[in-house]
Amino acid sequence: MEKWWFNSMLSNEELEHKCGLSKSADSLGPIGNASGSETPIINGIDKNIHSWSDNGSYSCSNVDHLFGVRDIWSFISDDTFLVRDSNGDSYSVYFDIENQIFEIHNDSYFLSELESAFSSYLNKRSFSSYLNSGPKSYNRNYDRYMYDTQYSWNNHINSCIDSYLHSEISIDSDIYSYICSESLSGSDSESSSIRTSINGSDFDINTKYGRLWVQCENCYGLNYQKFFRSKMNICERCGYYLKMSSSDRIELSIDPGTWDPMDEDMISMDPIEFHSEEEPYRDRIDFFQRTTGLTEAVQTGIGQLNGIPIAIGVMDFQFMGGSMGSVVGEKITRLIECATNRSLPVIIVCASGGARMQEGSLSLMQMAKISSALYNYQSNKKLFYVSILTSPTTGGVTASFGMLGDIIIAEPNAYIAFAGKRVIEQTLKKTIPEGSQAAEYLFHKGLFDLIVPRNPLKGVPSELFQLHGFFPLNQINKYK
């Protein structure tokens, strides 16, 4: 339903936008509800702005019994819109910015009287001004309906609304979201559509629209959340690979119904009692556990990949940057030991900022512990380990199990490094070329075996496993 928006404020000098009419303690009570009750009705409003009427003519009868012209000042506020849809039905739209209240009422009788009151007031002020000052000094601001063209009036309303949106409604409100996000469809003329611009300082797409849209980190285009997972978190506009959660990667890689997680109840206990002036370590752990639904920065377990039993660990960058603490190291070590005992191939998907500083040397020790378990797995048991490096893989993970795979696979354009660019530049006092820590550049230097896009990422390890003697269970049972 297309809705039409009228916003104006009556002042001594001119007719200015200040969002129409509102509640009054001295008059009728809540606008659009003469009974005095307040029943919120949630609805939306379009951002196509028109004048209140196409012809600009109004009747001013049957008004005095509601309120006189002098009483109209008590109705002026910043909080109410007069709205008319394409069917001619009228509404009053009230919202309180501070308390984020949004109400709509469609009492047609009251609104018709309200509309007439405005017309009556404008006509009386214009006529009085004409008599007192004469034709030459007559202020036409008070009679835009009678003398201004429709185009001029629309432009006036557009500029007022545009100014108001930028100056007043910079809050986390569904009203502002709806106005700024709805398309221009339904607008009959260019002059009647409001033009708004949004900058990152007061309008965060990810915060306000996270449940609907995902913003690309590269081109800043919006991807519809409903289809984003089915496209494996790849931007539709530029093809950029956005981060995936560990749960999404498990769903992508593991056959349905075969996932058996390990050590889900293992959590960090702040072993060195790390304290920060900003936020205690335990509070940070609790926060990320609530926001991600995970207990730690890695998920480990046993599953099947195209029918082949495997042991897999998937790191999650959303949990404290995927940092490796004592729990992460212990879970990965136990996974490798389980795979060693059961002669299973291992996949570890890396996405980490490195060792967790809140656990000091205990986090650094995990590098040696995991590497020791991998040495026994690879060298003594002659089993097969595939390392998959995603963006970002840095620090202690790069310096340990990330680069120890029998086959090392990287995602396209993944950021892979030991130290970050700023650290290197500040330490060596040299400028690091752009792209020198990207997967493609490092691949040509011989650091990886493969760069594999996400679409075939499940099939490639499956073929590698079969090449190394790991076959699907149905084929093993077939030959028995």
Curated annotation (Swiss-Prot):
Keyword set includes Nucleotide-binding: yes
Cofactor: Zn(2+)
Top enzyme category: transferase
GO BP terms in the entry: fatty acid biosynthetic process; malonyl-CoA biosynthetic process
Pathway of action: Lipid metabolism; malonyl-CoA biosynthesis; malonyl-CoA from acetyl-CoA: step 1/1
Predominant location: plastid
The enzyme's E.C. designation: 2.1.3.15
Subcellular location as annotated: Plastid, Chloroplast stroma
Subunit annotation: Acetyl-CoA carboxylase is a heterohexamer composed of biotin carboxyl carrier protein, biotin carboxylase and 2 subunits each of ACCase subunit alpha and ACCase plastid-coded subunit beta (accD).
NCBIfam families, sorted: accD
Name this polypeptide is given: Acetyl-coenzyme A carboxylase carboxyl transferase subunit beta, chloroplastic
Provenance organism: Illicium oligandrum
Upper taxonomic lineage: Eukaryota, Viridiplantae, Streptophyta, Embryophyta, Tracheophyta
Name of the coding gene: accD
